[in-house]
UniProtKB/Swiss-Prot annotation:
This is Transaldolase 2. Transaldolase is important for the balance of metabolites in the pentose-phosphate pathway. InterPro entries: Aldolase_TIM (IPR013785), TAL/FSA (IPR001585), Transaldolase_2 (IPR004732), Transaldolase_AS (IPR018225). It comes from Streptomyces coelicolor (strain ATCC BAA-471 / A3(2) / M145). PANTHER family: TRANSALDOLASE (PTHR10683:SF31). GO terms for cellular component: cytoplasm. It is found in: Cytoplasm. Belongs to the transaldolase family. Type 2 subfamily. GO terms for biological process: carbohydrate metabolic process; pentose-phosphate shunt. The active site is at 140 (schiff-base intermediate with substrate).
Length: 372
């Protein structure tokens, strides 16, 4: 056992857990992770809730109560998921208070079927914020083209946002622009900018998974030399973009008005390829004012044998650019890969949501009172 998680936290990395279930809440496990593993936030997504609700009996009582009331499947899902987020937010509330609202956050995602509908996404974000009714909630909005104006409008309403499914550097810059636009709207409306927080979830491991697959198809030694380099390089260049945007006069004016920076959040940090270190997407992306949301296995691996040796991003930009250029020269299109990953990301969450609808409907029918 190492003190890696403490050192990670000391380096300015907020450690969040990429998982939530009722069992994790009621068993005291979440409180234990906060107390002992330096966890200061939680992220959820449709896949996480689908897994949580379809496994075990932790939701049976609430589902039975909802079945008696005759609620729709979608109403049931919203009541179940917002209840978990609300309870997790209450457990994390002391962290929220102690960090001035920066951490102690729980994220809940808008219906992924709305990813390409700006107005419906904003309406859903407002409804979720109202339903959870906790100040330490982040509403997750995907960084699709339609999501960008929704992000700006939601921030402009004073709602804190976790922007998700970011894969490309170009899209990340647009996300930061949407965030700044939202803050400018909020300022015009007379809102307190200091109460608005945001993170931008930049996905990591999926980039290596897709690019490595294409490298393996090429099969040359030159190609194989680039395995496992794309994701970290991409994320490091994202941090460079973050430094540039939050060094502008536009940002300075908002900061003077009380605004908080939108932090980069490294998401999808579980290592899929056993050839790599199981902590590489943590140890190789240590940088000040970032968040790393980890599956529990990655969190525990980092605690056990993670080597935290200070800032791993500063001074890395030239090497990172060279790595991406070398991959492009192999004939692997960066733009094609990141566009595919965004589409697949939205599709995966939509599929998980549809599976959640089906399994919840089946449970409501099973637990409904018999007629007669």
């Amino acid at each position: 056992m190492t003190d890696a998680l403490k050192r990670l936290s000391d380096e300015g990395v907020a450690i969040w857990l990429d998982d939530l279930s009722r069992k994790r809440i009621t068993s005291g496990n979440l409180a234990e992770l906060i107390d002992q593993q330096h966890v200061v936030g939680v992220t959820t997504n449709p896949s996480i809730f689908q897994k949580a609700i379809s496994q075990g009996d932790g939701y049976d009582q609430q589902l039975a109560d909802l079945a008696v009331r005759g609620v729709t499947v979608e109403e049931a899902i919203r009541m179940i998921t917002t209840a978990d987020v609300r309870d997790a937010a209450d457990i994390l509330r002391p962290v929220y208070d102690n960090t001035g609202g920066k951490d102690g956050r729980v994220s809940i995602e808008v219906d992924p079927r709305l990813a390409h509908n700006t107005h419906a996404t904003v309406a859903e974000a407002k409804q979720l914020a109202w339903l959870v009714d906790r100040p330490n909630t982040f509403i997750k909005i995907p960084a699709t083209e339609a999501g960008l104006p929704a992000i700006a409008e939601t921030i402009g309403l004073g709602i804190s946002v976790n922007v998700t499914l970011i894969f490309s550097l170009e899209r990340y810059r647009k996300v930061m622009d949407a965030f700044l636009t939202g803050l400018e709207k909020a300022k015009e409306r007379g809102l307190d900018l200091s109460q608005i927080h945001s993170v931008a979830s930049f996905f990591v491991s999926r980039v290596d998974t897709e690019i490595d697959k294409r490298i393996d198809a090429l099969g040359t030694d030159e190609a194989k030399a680039q395995r496992g380099k794309a994701a970290v390089a991409n994320a490091r260049l994202a941090y460079q973009a973050y430094e540039e945007v939050f060094g502008t006069d536009r940002w300075a004016a908002l900061e003077k008005a009380g605004a908080n920076k939108q932090r980069p959040l490294w998401a999808s940090t579980g290592v899929k390829d056993k050839a790599y270190s199981d902590t590489m997407y943590v140890t190789d992306l240590v940088a000040p004012n970032t968040v790393n949301t980890m599956p529990e296995a990655t969190l525990l691996a980092t605690e056990d044998h993670g080597e935290i040796t200070g800032d791993a991003v500063a001074g890395s930009y030239e090497r990172a650019r060279a790595d991406l250029d070398a991959i492009e020269k192999l004939g692997i299109s960066y733009d094609e890969v990141v566009q595919l990953l965004e589409k697949e990301g939205v599709d995966k969450f939509e599929d998980a949501w549809n599976d959640l609808l089906k399994s919840t409907e089946a449970e409501l029918k099973r637990l409904a009172p018999s007629k007669g």
